[in-house]
């Protein structure tokens, strides 16, 4: 036991200071919010739309990109001969309205998630218990949600915890495209959470079905089964993107430090 204590003393404090301090630097391979330069698109070019594996890009009447469907695979960026699509380093992607994830040309920022109303923040602002439902996910989004519980992120310091039963929860955190076999289970889980409650959809699959969209055995995301209060896109979203969304929902972010 003494060796454990000595090792802990030597390691010192490992939890990052964010959001009280600036966020950690994102890795070189990180791909954040895309930026569209529609003016660069030559007439009749469909290179980006044809390259997109999920149909996230539309060109009529102008270039649009649906982040709810986007896998951040950069196939469109690589396919575009005019560099009309580039990925920024902006990790802030969470929104309250699904429609807010549809990017227009030269759109500088998303309409980022607004905080819950005052009554809800009083209930959940310092103690939010979530039941995580993997509705047919591949475990990538689940893994990055799990990362938030490690010592580096320490999700519990914000009063946010994952619980084992929906009856002990304030809401649901849903991953996966919602397979046919999980549709009823998700609905029953939602009904078991006491009101008032919130629902958070994490990852492209939970937002739109992701690469499985329109398959006969999936529901194209959580919103087709239960109402959703927060949408966090990505495949999978970075832990910082997930944390940013949760803190925005609870009104616990100082914008000057993000």
Question: Could you describe each region identified by the protein language model?
Answer:
Residues 36, 45-94:
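Iron-sulfur cluster-binding cysteine motifs and their immediate structural context
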Residues 1-51:
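Ferredoxin-type iron-sulfur electron-transfer modules and their immediate structural context
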Residues 242-250:
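Short amphipathic C-terminal alpha-helix that caps PH/PH-like domains
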Residues 250-258:
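Structural signature of the thiamine diphosphate
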Residues 143-145, 150-243:
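Cofactor-cradling patches in redox/metallo enzymes
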Residues 39, 67, 88-90, 104, ...:
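Fold-independent oxyanion-binding glycine-rich loops
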Residues 1-16, 21-23, 78-165, 218, ...:
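Flanking helices and flexible, charged tails adjoining ferredoxin-like Fe-S electron-transfer domains
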Residues 208, 246, 256:
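Long C-terminal interaction/binding lobes of large macromolecular proteins
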């Amino acid at each position: 036991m003494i060796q454990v204590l000595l090792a802990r003393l030597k390691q010192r404090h490992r939890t990052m200071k964010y959001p009280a301090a600036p966020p950690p630097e994102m890795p070189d391979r990180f791909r954040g919010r895309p930026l569209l330069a529609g003016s660069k698109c030559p007439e009749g070019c469909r290179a980006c739309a044809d390259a997109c594996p999920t149909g996230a890009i539309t060109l009529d009447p102008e270039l649009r990109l649906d982040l709810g469907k986007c896998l951040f695979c950069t196939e469109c960026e690589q396919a575009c001969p005019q560099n009309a699509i580039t990925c920024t380093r902006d990790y802030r992607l969470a929104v309250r309205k699904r429609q807010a994830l549809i990017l227009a040309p030269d759109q500088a920022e998303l309409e980022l998630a607004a905080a819950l109303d005052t009554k809800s923040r009083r209930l959940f602002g310092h103690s939010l218990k979530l039941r995580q439902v993997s509705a047919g996910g591949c475990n990538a989004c689940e893994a990055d949600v799990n990362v938030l519980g490690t010592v580096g992120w320490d999700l519990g310091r914000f009063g946010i915890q994952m619980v084992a039963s929906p009856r002990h929860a304030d809401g649901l955190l849903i991953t996966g495209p919602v397979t046919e076999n999980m549709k009823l289970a998700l609905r029953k889980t939602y009904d078991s959470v006491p009101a008032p409650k919130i629902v958070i959809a994490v990852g492209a699959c939970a937002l739109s079905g992701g690469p499985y969209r329109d398959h006969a055995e999936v529901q194209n995301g959580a919103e087709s089964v239960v109402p959703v209060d927060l949408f966090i896109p990505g495949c999978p979203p970075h832990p910082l993107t997930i944390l940013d969304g949760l803190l925005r929902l609870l009104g616990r972010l100082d914008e000057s430090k993000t």
